[in-house]
Amino acid sequence: MLQALLIFVLQIIYVPILTIRTILLVKNQTRSAAGVGLLEGAIYIVSLGIVFQDLSNWMNIVAYVIGFSAGLLLGGYIENKLAIGYITYQVSLLDRCNELVDELRHSGFGVTVFEGEGINSIRYRLDIVAKRSREKELLEIINEIAPKAFMSSYEIRSFKGGYLTKAMKKRALMKKKDHHAS
């Protein structure tokens, strides 16, 4: 029984680590992923080793399977809280909605406005880049000012140039100055 509990706990730890490592690889953060992978590998070997010691012990096998499933739930929760990376939203509007554009820019989001041809009239599209950790804030602003907007989103793997890059460089320089001042 103690072994089954240990296996369950190890799986609850192992699977979220596996989730984080996978996300880091997808985000092209290979060094961080390799570091996390060391811990992941050690936990994997220990827990699977306990299961393989006695394959007739069904409690250990059940603990492994249930722990894996619970670990997936926990891993997904942790991933959402970490919100690593950036996201782009494309927002389609019937009118230009300067109020929305101004509020988004004032809140620090990068916004580009496009004018396009719809079936019956001119349409406007906003491309908005944000850190995933600010996605909820972004959606609240859009839904408050333009609740009927059509939105689609996708994650950004990498980017170069533009407002966001300049803003990040500016913040990094300010942090450097603050660090040297202390």
From Swiss-Prot:
One cellular component (GO) term of this entry: plasma membrane
InterPro entries: DUF2179, DUF5698, UPF0316
Keyword Cell membrane carried by entry: yes
Family: Belongs to the UPF0316 family.
Protein name: UPF0316 protein BCAH187_A3394
Localization terms from the record: Cell membrane
Keywords: Cell membrane, Membrane, Transmembrane, Transmembrane helix
Membrane topology, from the record: Multi-pass membrane protein
Predominant location: membrane
Transmembrane regions: 6-26, 32-52, 58-78
Pfam families the UniProt entry points to: DUF2179, DUF5698
